[in-house]
Amino acid sequence: MASSVRAPSGSVIAVASSSSSAALAGVCGTGSPCAACKFLRRKCQPDCVFAPYFPPDNPQKFVRVHRVFGASNVTKLMNEIHPLQREDAMNSLAYEADMRIRDPVYGCVGVISILQHNLRQLQQDLARAKYELSKYQAAAAASASTAPTGPQAMAEFIGSAMPNGAAHNFINLGHSAALGSLGGSTAMFGQQEQFGSNAQMLSRSYDGGEPIARIGMNNGGYEFGYSSATTMGGSAGAVSGGLGTLGISSPPFLKSGTAGGDEKPSGGY
């Protein structure tokens, strides 16, 4: 019962009796019993273990759990686990019960097997893709490390740009030209060396070791003279012999090769 008490300010305060409080306590916090108590047709107590996990707006959740596992087994399980783990446990029981109703033989095990098979297939595909990628990366690294640089790259570029045989002929031509140039230089050096030895032979003295003839290397000039008047005859013969050694016939007069030089008569004329 409820009684009213008049306050000093004139307002009325209603006070509920103990019987009314007990009646309100039998109803859940939302004003209606939970899905478990409603399905079991019992009074929902304030400490009902099903009320937090089986709300009245989803009655089929408890119906499936009760059908597969039983309300007594669910109550026993909830009393054995920690209160913080009860929500996950009730959601797991609800999922397993739903899968068992859909597939009475395998239940959730069949779904788990399918998911595991898909996971293994994806792992194999990923490993295969990584293997193919590693092969491409290794080939790219090998080609980059063995790529020709400098003269070798230029030679390969010339060889690829020229027709077949053209590069070989080009190399042979350059080799022949180099040998010809080297041979010409050698021949010229040999001629100069032979001319120098003949000049030394001509400048050798035939009268007491004194030089009586000299051929100038500049402008191809030459000079001729005697060491003394008494030996002119013998010296002329010696010089004539020296010119014969060079393969040059004795002219009637020998002239100086330098510009503006005086003419010197031969000893024999």
Swiss-Prot record:
Residues 32-133 form the LOB domain. Keywords: Developmental protein, Nucleus. It comes from the Eukaryota. One of its GO terms (cellular component) is nucleus. The keyword Ribosomal protein does not apply. Belongs to the LOB domain-containing protein family. InterPro entries: LOB. It is found in: Nucleus. Might be partially redundant with the LBD6/AS2/IG1 gene. Expressed in leaves, leaf primordia, immature ears, immature tassels, whole ovules, silk and husk leaves. Its main location: nucleus. The keyword Isomerase does not apply. It holds the Pfam family LOB. This is Protein IAL1.
